[in-house]
Structures are given as structure tokens and as C-alpha cells.
From Swiss-Prot:
Organism listed in the record: Drosophila melanogaster (Fruit fly)
Record function comment: Required for regulating the establishment of planar cell polarity in the wing. Forms a complex with Bdbt which likely functions in the regulation of planar polarity by promoting the activity of Dco during planar polarity establishment. Within the complex, probably functions to stabilize Bdbt, while Bdbt directly promotes Dco activity in regulating phosphorylation of core proteins such as dsh, and asymmetric localization.
Protein name per its UniProtKB record: Ankyrin repeat domain-containing protein 49
The UniProt record lists the keyword Cell membrane: yes
Subunit structure: Interacts with Bdbt; interaction promotes the stability of both complex members.
Alphabetized UniProt keyword annotations: ANK repeat, Cell membrane, Cytoplasm, Developmental protein, Membrane, Repeat
Effect of residue 87 to Y: Lethal. Pupal wings containing clones display reduced levels of dsh, reduced asymmetric localization of stan, delayed trichome initiation, and formation of trichomes in the cell center rather than at the distal cell edge
């Protein structure tokens, strides 16, 4: 990790430790059907792991960088629901933050208690730029949550998901015909929830041609 224990770095983290935390809510703990807001962390300064989770959520990139220099292992810290700093950067579409975390070897396939990866989180909020970045760093485009929801299934629940759907469907490893626990394809969900379903159906057709499922 190197010797990063300079006075300036310690000072930055100490400022963060005593920072006034806004009384907001952190988005976390989603199940496969709906978003949930979990109770805010009322004391993020109590540990360096909680500090980095809070700082990422507030997009305080300089403070996050200093925390990582002091303790690089915090890059994969988890909250009570299993969300990592990278999950939080992904669902907020903090692309520069996500890039910093990935450069410090954040796990792009880390899973929450419900089996969500950072890519699921990016797709839930139609954050195409973060989704693209995660795929570049080895995120599993077909990762299944506990409900067998892939990132493509999650994308399909968003009415205006054209950009993110395109990013996923252009990935060479995408399997658009995977079914979730309800035995639904992503295209079926997309047809029910929004105007982007032609993209999903075109993706399935291209996949079928590529894999020889149709003549």
C-alpha cells in the first residue's frame, strides 16, 4: 500500500471525521421489485469504513482519495445491506468516483445481501456511463441477483432506458434470453414498462443470429 501516512493526508481525513453530515437518506437495500430507503448512517465518523461509504455517497472525491491512501482495503467496505463504495458511486452515476475506486481495485462484481452487483445499481438508475465503465473493468454483464435478475432485467424496469440497454446489449458476453425467477425475459419486462422494448427485441434477434438459435 505504501507509506501514505503524511500529516496532510491525516489532516484531510480528520476534517472528514468531524464533518457535519447532512440528515439525508441513503438509497440501499433494494429488493428485486422496488427501491427502499434505509435509515441514514447517523454516525459515519465512527470508523474509516463508514467514513468512505459516506464520502462516496456525497461525491467527496478528494476525501475518498485520502482515505484510500491511508487504507486501500476500505475500497471494498460494506454497509449493513452489503453495498460497497462502488455500488454507491454506480447508483449515483458518479463516474469519476467509480473510476477512482476501480483503480484502487474495487470489486466490480461485489454482491449485496440480495445479490446485487454495482452494475445492477447503475442499471436501476439508467446510469449508462457508469455501466459502461463497470463493464470495461470486468463487471459480469449476466450477473444474477437472488431473484435471478440480470442487469438487463433491471434496466428493463426503467421506462426510459435506451442508453443503458444499448450499452448492455452491445457487450459481447450478453445473454438476453436469460429468465428471472418469474420466468420472464428482459424484453417482456421492457414491453410492459416502457417505450424502449424494440431495443431489447432487436438485441434478442441479434443474439439468436449470432448463436445459431434461428436459421
Amino acid at each position: 500500500m505504501g507509506d501514505y501516512d503524511s500529516d496532510d493526508e491525516k489532516s484531510q481525513v480528520e476534517k472528514l471525521r468531524h464533518a457535519k453530515v447532512p440528515r439525508g437518506m441513503f438509497v440501499s437495500g433494494w429488493d428485486d421489485d422496488a427501491d427502499e430507503l434505509i435509515e441514514e448512517d447517523k454516525n459515519p465518523q465512527s470508523s474509516i469504513e463508514r467514513m468512505i461509504l459516506w464520502a462516496v455517497n456525497e461525491n467527496r472525491i478528494s476525501e475518498v482519495r485520502e482515505i484510500l491512501k491511508l487504507d486501500a482495503d476500505t475500497v471494498n467496505a460494506k454497509d449493513n445491506d452489503g453495498y460497497t463504495p462502488l455500488h454507491r458511486a454506480a447508483y449515483n452515476n458518479f463516474v469519476d468516483m467509480a473510476k477512482l475506486l476501480l483503480q484502487y481495485h474495487a470489486n466490480p462484481n461485489a454482491r449485496t445481501e440480495l445479490g446485487w452487483t454495482p452494475l445492477h445499481s447503475a442499471c436501476k438508475w439508467n446510469n449508462a456511463d457508469c455501466a459502461h465503465l463497470l463493464l470495461q473493468f470486468g463487471a459480469d454483464v449476466n450477473a444474477e441477483s437472488d431473484g435471478k435478475q440480470t442487469p438487463l432485467h433491471i434496466t428493463a424496469t426503467v421506462s426510459n432506458c435506451r442508453n443503458t440497454a444499448t450499452v448492455l446489449l452491445l457487450d459481447r458476453y450478453i445473454q438476453p434470453r436469460k429468465e428471472n425467477n418469474s420466468e420472464e425475459l428482459a424484453s417482456v419486462i421492457a414491453r410492459r414498462t416502457g417505450m424502449s422494448f424494440p431495443i431489447f427485441e432487436s438485441g434478442e434477434e441479434a443474439y439468436d443470429c449470432e448463436t445459431g438459435l434461428i436459421d
